[in-house]
């Protein structure tokens, strides 16, 4: 993948940000913006910006529409609005390279939460505690899966990588890890998916999960040998 990065930095077109609007909602739906330090109730016709995080409770959902996209966030899920977009394979490769850079160990003394970096130091302790919890990380993984279900597979992969970086404990969930590794495999990114399956193999897996992971690793080995 590395040999493509320098080329992509110059060749990938800049994606123009969209403004999204809440079209329909059901139940308890909240949002957190960079201009607020607490969660706010989402209302119909509310305008959402790309840094906003939207979260649904159980038995709740929200329909979000942009210029050329619509997305329904189902119950017990969360998503950053910026992730609601279509991406090309080249854009995905570049985003994965950037995620690798973000995963580089930080220097001592630079231990600020990623969420504090986005929402500022004025964010309330209660809100920050919710944002940084493993449960909220799982809600964001649910949202990432729904991106894939709506045809935005590349964005789903990027969203999952961000979640795994910010919420390391969510990487222990084998079912979700396999789901997103399969998306990488389906995108033809065999080296990247191989790395994922190799990590997943170290988790506590059910027998069918072990078989699936081993089968994928064998398939990738054959593809890379014949490359």
Regions found by a protein language model. Give the residues of each.
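TPR-adjacent "capping" and linker segments in tetratricopeptide-repeat scaffold/adaptor proteins
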Residues: 114, 120-140, 167-169
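Sec-dependent N-terminal signal peptides
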Residues: 4-13
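Glycine- and acidic-residue-biased ligand/ion/polar-headgroup-sensing regions
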Residues: 18-37, 57-61, 69, 75-77, ...
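Short solvent-exposed coil/turn linkers within tandem alpha-helical repeat scaffolds
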Residues: 166-171, 200-215
């Amino acid at each position: 993948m590395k040999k493509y990065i320098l080329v992509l930095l110059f060749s990938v077109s800049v994606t123009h940000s969209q403004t999204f609007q809440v079209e329909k909602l059901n139940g308890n739906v909240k949002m957190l913006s960079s201009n607020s330090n607490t969660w706010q109730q989402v209302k119909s016709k509310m305008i959402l910006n790309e840094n906003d995080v939207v979260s649904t409770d159980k038995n709740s959902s929200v329909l979000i529409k942009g210029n050329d996209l619509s997305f329904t966030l189902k119950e017990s899920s969360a998503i950053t609005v910026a992730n609601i977009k279509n991406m090309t394979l080249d854009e995905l490769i570049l985003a994965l390279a950037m995620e690798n850079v973000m995963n580089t160990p930080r220097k001592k003394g630079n231990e600020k939460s990623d969420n504090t970096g986005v929402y500022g130091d004025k964010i309330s302790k209660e809100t920050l505690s919710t944002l940084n919890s493993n449960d909220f990380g799982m809600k964001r993984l649910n949202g990432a899966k729904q991106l894939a279900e709506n045809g935005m597979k590349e964005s789903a992969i990027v969203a999952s990588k961000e979640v795994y970086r910010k919420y390391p404990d969510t990487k222990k969930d084998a079912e979700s890890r396999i789901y997103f590794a399969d998306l990488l495999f389906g995108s033809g990114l065999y080296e990247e998916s191989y790395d994922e399956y190799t990590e997943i193999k170290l988790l506590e897996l059910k027998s069918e999960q072990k078989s699936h992971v081993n089968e994928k690793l064998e398939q990738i080995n054959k593809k890379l040998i014949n490359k």
